[in-house]
Amino acid sequence: MKNKSNQGQAILLAALLLGGATSCFDDSYDLNKDIDMTINVGGENLAFPVGNTEKVTLDKIIEIEEGDDLQTDASGAYHLLKSGKIDDVNTRVEPVTVQATDTEIDPIEVANESDFEAAGSLEISTEREQNKEIETHAENVDEAVKEIYKLTPNTTPINIILTKEGNIDLKTLNAKVTITFSPVLEIKEATEGNKVIFNLTKEDLRNGDFTYTVHLTNITFGDGTKGNGRVIGDDRRVDISENVTVSIKADIVANEIPAGGTLTLTPTIHIGEMEVVQVEGIIDPTLDESTSSMELTGLPDFLENDETKLDIANPIFTFHANNPLNTPVEITGILSGSKNGQPIEGSEVAIGSGATDPIILQPGDNTIALSRLGEGGPEGAVNIEVSDINNLIQTIPDVVNVSIQPSVNSQEYYTVDLDKTYTVACDYDIDIPLAFGANLNIVYEETIEDLGGDLEDVDFSKAVLSASVDNTIPLALTLPDENVEVLDANGQKIEGIQVKVTGNIAAGNGTEQPVTSKLDIQLETTQPGTLNQLDAIKLKIVAASGGKEGLQLYDTQWLQLKDIKLKVPNGVKVDLN
């Protein structure tokens, strides 16, 4: 960005009309030798009217180039704008494997000699059952998992194997087999009560055994109420021990019953190794800290001056983040500024963690707007008041550093896919509207050059530059005496010149109706030949809000100097020798 200033030109016109009646002089008189041609012009009322300047609008003072961070919106309002991406935050929960298990249940004696004797027939009906605990476990459960409500494996087959034994000569067998699993083991094919029911015939057992396959879909602990899940201890192990009952209701017709004859079926429940793909429970994954930096470039000189102290009415830092987890993520962090590679003292601003309202990313897309007033964010944003956020930009940094630490603090159950990287993606928009508060202090330095001209032939001890100033810019401009330096052609300060500035430029109202002020800059010396060394004036102009807090800067606001006069109260001495 470049700044334009109208270079003041020192106009000292000695309109010296020396009468042409040379015939009144003796032709033999040597003017160059015998007469001192140093004369005094103007007395005490010498004044040179300079006139008026054109209206100087802010867009002439602040020239914006494409790509600069300072831009104007459609209305012409100045905004310091910056967009970019913050480093992604990643997390994952490592996979869990539940070990394979074979549970052999005690043999079920479906029929024996006594059953037939009691019936007095070769045709009987019986009902028998056995039960046992299915035991397995998982080790090395990820540290993030605090309590498990549900484990979801890849669909895992459960083989129910019935092995026939005994010496009863069967004519027919029609059996109804009911396997009742614990509600912890959710079976895809189960009916109400988590029962698996199938029929078994003599033909099914012709090879001595029969296998019926069902599928395990979930291992569910508790009743879904927080605290009723399986809490994981320091050993990071989950032990599963759940009851299974096998009931066989059989209709049997025998050809013959040998002495001591029996028919037994031995159930074996085989569950293969399970790769758990999803966990539901209380899960506290570790989320990486994210540190990023944003560079502010192409700023005008008055913003980059080390003495400038900004007081922005409502700067807004907007963050857009996608939370891929099925639970809220809380954000805490530090924003800070640095300049020329060094931290700016006092620029740190804490967010979240008690410093502000909690900053919560709900599952899915989020827009969080951090601002001084807690308002003004884009539509749909959650506005968070950060009352001290101006500290970050009070001294305008060339780099804004962002350090954020996401965390999951939920004590509610939610679901996480295992062996999957979750990425919290985040980008930002900075919008600093140039509407200032009461503590604004902008310092703008400008040098008005090439004022010397032919001043070596003119000697004067006092000069006053006076003007009437119309201002619509909502900034009050002051020029303290000590902020005016008179320089010679070598750029060195000329000593012995006293500067007195009378009046200030009052702030405009931000409307087209100007506020008018009077301004005098007086230069005076007691040392002859001093002021005529003047070649440049260096000004350090201080801008403040001037009681117009919150008014926005627009590129159409303007300032105009009228009735400009250069007064030389004691006249000038012109050397015509």
Map each language-model feature to its residues.
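Bacterial N-terminal signal peptides that target proteins for export
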Residues: K2-I11
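Short, well-ordered helical secondary-structure segments
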Residues: I11-L12, L553
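Hydrophobic helical h-region of N-terminal Sec-dependent signal peptides
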Residues: L12-L18
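C-terminal motif of bacterial Sec signal peptides marking the signal peptidase cleavage site
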Residues: G19-S23
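Extracellular/secretory-pathway and virion-surface proteins
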Residues: C24-N577
